[in-house]
Amino acid sequence: MAQKQTPSGPTQRQQRVAELIRHALAEVLQRGDIQDPVLGSHVVTVPEVRMSPDLKLATAYVMPLGGQDEAPVIAALERHKKILRQEVARRVNLKFAPDLRFRRDETFDEAARIDQLLRSEKVQRDLESAPREDDEGEPDSSSRD
């Protein structure tokens, strides 16, 4: 039975499988099951995994703690992709173990950019000049009889 891919995003099954794989990857990386000097010297977080509609490809978004040495960490994960796939397959009960892809997680950068925009002088000026909800002439609920 084919799963429907909705234009609004991934299916519930894709999300559930992605979360299982995220937990499995995080556990493998936390325990240090992969013997690699780069991975051994960094704490790697896995904030998100996205699954393809057929559940055969998992894209893991990773970030070393502190955000430094991203390229070597991703290269090390790519080198050990086969072992990581085997470990994920051992921990997650699926018909097929998905191929793994590793990408840099950019959500922290995006959050910092949005925070910087919100703190900008222009936005602060707009917020100060905007009318407040309680100033719009609506009666206060405490003054009702």
UniProtKB/Swiss-Prot annotation:
Regions of compositional bias (Basic and acidic residues) in chain numbering: 122-132
Provide the Gene Ontology terms for cellular component: cytosol
According to the UniProt entry, its GO molecular function terms are:
ribosomal small subunit binding
Which PROSITE patterns does the annotation name? Answer: RBFA
Alphabetically sorted, this entry's keywords are: Cytoplasm, Ribosome biogenesis
Per UniProt, subcellular location reads as: Cytoplasm
Q: Which InterPro entries match?
A: KH_dom-like_a/b, RbfA, RbfA_dom_sf, Ribosome-bd_factorA_CS
Region labeled Disordered — which residues? 122-145
One of the GO BP terms on file: maturation of SSU-rRNA
What does the record note on quaternary structure?
Answer: Monomer. Binds 30S ribosomal subunits, but not 50S ribosomal subunits or 70S ribosomes.
Protein family membership: Belongs to the RbfA family.
Role of this protein: One of several proteins that assist in the late maturation steps of the functional core of the 30S ribosomal subunit. Associates with free 30S ribosomal subunits (but not with 30S subunits that are part of 70S ribosomes or polysomes). Required for efficient processing of 16S rRNA. May interact with the 5'-terminal helix region of 16S rRNA.
What is this protein called in UniProt?
Ribosome-binding factor A
Gene this chain is encoded by:
rbfA
